[in-house]
Amino acid sequence: MQQTDLKTRNQLEHLNPKGAYAELGNLLRLRFAAKDLRLFAPRAVKSQLNGAERTRFRGRGMDFEEVRLYQAGDDVRSIDWRVTARTQVPHTKLYREERERPVYIFVDQRASLFFGSQHCFKSVLATHIGSNIAWAALNNGDRIGGLVFGDNNQRDIKPRRSKHAVLELLHQLHEFNHQLNSPIASPDAKTLVSVLSDARRIAKPGCALFIVSDFHDYDQFCEQQLFELARHTDVTLIHVFDPLEQALKSNARLSVSDGVNRLQLPTDNADFQQAYENAFNDHVGFLSNSAKRLGITLLSYATVDNLQLMLRERFAAKK
């Protein structure tokens, strides 16, 4: 058993993101890994807007669930006459019905993600996360749509329940990823708040919305947009980052450049290192507290993480 688990783990690690650019073949191969992922757990339905998960309804459905005492309002066609005759008390059959829930996947491919100090760039990590979610949604029979956005353009993928929708998303991820060539954005680059505003137009009520980004420009205006989104959609934020953004440890000064100007940073100074670390923690703390206030899920993955293993820990299908 341990040998099998080790073999599976090694196979999954082979699918983890690597390098500065995403490879389409690797994104396609994630289909085999995503078969073990389940995005949604079964729960009782609250309204007709719920979908993409197994929900409980009175009356005829897909799968037989259980028999219980007849209640006022039950469909008489669902009465279990055998149990009723045996007990002399009316009983009703309950069924489970598969309710559709479109899944929208928004993936950030702006310049700020074109960075990585180990294993892979943030932009590559984001493409792998988005691809895993898309394949998992397809395996669950959901409609898949989304948006891939860069600094100056974006591509909307209309929701469809087919492999073609996933393939379109993967091709757009690959195309946008390979357009990146610098971590420095132009002054008129697309902002996250504008993308979230578009999300309110694109994502339909009752859908599940996954947003993959480094959220470097997340602010109170973004929170306002998310507040409106979260009223009608099930939002999950997926934050990607690199360890070098989290902490900067160096015994020597480092030089940075935007391609025109060059600046030397006192990275060997303890006060500078602490201020650098505090800036990252403060921003992530604001993002985390914002998600809590809105009642939405926030997940974080680093470029050095074993992504496939961590996705299974979060979205493991129940055997």
Residue ranges of predicted features:
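N-terminal low-complexity, intrinsically disordered segments
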Residues: R77-T87
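Exposed, interaction-prone extracellular/peripheral surfaces
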Residues: Q2-R56, L69-D74, V83, T92-H128, ...
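Acidic, metal-associated active-site segment
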Residues: E66
